[in-house]
Amino acid sequence: MLKIIFPSIMLLPLTWLSANKKIWTNVTSYSFLVSLLSLSLLWQNDENYLNFSVMFSSDPLSTPLIILTTWLLPLMMLASQNHMKKENMMHQKLYISMLISLQILLIMTFSATELILFYILFEATLIPTLIIITRWGNQTERLNAGIYFLFYTLIGSIPLLIALISIQNSMGTLNFLILSLTTHPLPSTWSNTILWLACMMAFMIKMPLYGVHLWLPKAHVEAPIAGSMILAAILLKLGGYGMMRVSIILDPLTKSLAYPFIILSLWGMIMTSSICLRQTDLKSLIAYSSVSHMALVITAIMIQTPWSFMGATMLMIAHGLTSSLLFCLANTNYERIHSRTMIMARGLQMIFPLMATWWLLASLANLALPPLINLMGELFIVMATFSWSNPSIILMATNIVITGIYSMYMIITTQRGKLTSHMNNLQPSHTRELTLMALHIIPLMLLTINPKLITGLTM
């Protein structure tokens, strides 16, 4: 694990010691090398942990998320260059340092083997994200979004800390490797119900669950491009990862306590998909579609069958790449038109035909087109939910239809139609932008060939 963490830490001195002209090139190319290094984690057995030390190890659930984290840093560097070029060098270096420190914290979070260490790192990711949103966001509403993000996360996390200390006292350890071996079923008492809620709510707010999702659209809309990418691709997945890890300890309780949350997330899935249909703001639409997809993941994790866990892991990885791609595309529009309103950007297919191709591919990936891993993940979840409760197929089918409708609405509004009069001197697509889109789509295509890499814990 240190072979990934140490090179990531060394990106910080590279940022501050590089020549001003070379800074973006150096950091981008070096972070690509780090992401290639992380691929070595895939060469491991199906079931066992790769134990690197007492503190850090990886297994089939954390490995895909670590690789996704390292893959995203160079992509964020590519996406941010135009946004940051007006800032002075000091601010540019600070911005890059924030993204690097976020990557280091995320890699350590996903590879932590001890729950208190996981909790500390899980909370530490909040600080760089908050600074990125409140310092480099576009509008003044970014401060409001930052406050929402901070307080929602903190209110969920404080009960989690108390619950973890309580579990430490009763079990004597919080190490994943030992906890999975201890047979210590929690009896169904009031105090254990509160313990379960305290453990799960922190992760549900991070996912986010419908009802505690209000921070997400605000944070996404106000964040700069790199903030939106890392938030959609990785930080939401922290919630799902945490739920999968903690559910090992809370085993028999989840079966009875999961019902209201499964129902709420299924209902929320329909509601947020419907909200997407009446959005005028492009980033807001993508943010609400993220809530809808994450509701599927919450449902799958709560059902707790091998198929649903596989579906949840696959959908998390697929959604990470797809939503990040959609935010990049929205950003290319914003940099040219200086507005997120979809109706202002109509007819862009006439000017940017190649970018329209990426829009089409991204929309199709978002609505889970066969044979992409998005579809495999959703199919596993739909089948697991159907075997849990037959009537749930109605809600699932409705959601799939609405997802198709809002994906079409998004692409037709932004790409088709007559050009508006204010679009007279737009700069063409840069090679940097087209490369960025390709680097999102290619992993999605390649994972379709071998989805076994991201099926996660098959219990």
From Swiss-Prot:
Enzyme class per UniProt: translocase
GO CC, one annotated term: mitochondrial inner membrane
Bilayer topology term: Multi-pass membrane protein
Keywords: Electron transport, Membrane, Mitochondrion, Mitochondrion inner membrane, NAD, Respiratory chain, Translocase, Transmembrane, Transmembrane helix, Transport, Ubiquinone
GO annotation (BP), single: mitochondrial electron transport, NADH to ubiquinone
NCBIfam families associated with the record: NDH_I_M
Function: Core subunit of the mitochondrial membrane respiratory chain NADH dehydrogenase (Complex I) which catalyzes electron transfer from NADH through the respiratory chain, using ubiquinone as an electron acceptor. Essential for the catalytic activity and assembly of complex I.
Protein name (database record): NADH-ubiquinone oxidoreductase chain 4
Source lineage: Eukaryota, Metazoa, Chordata, Craniata, Vertebrata
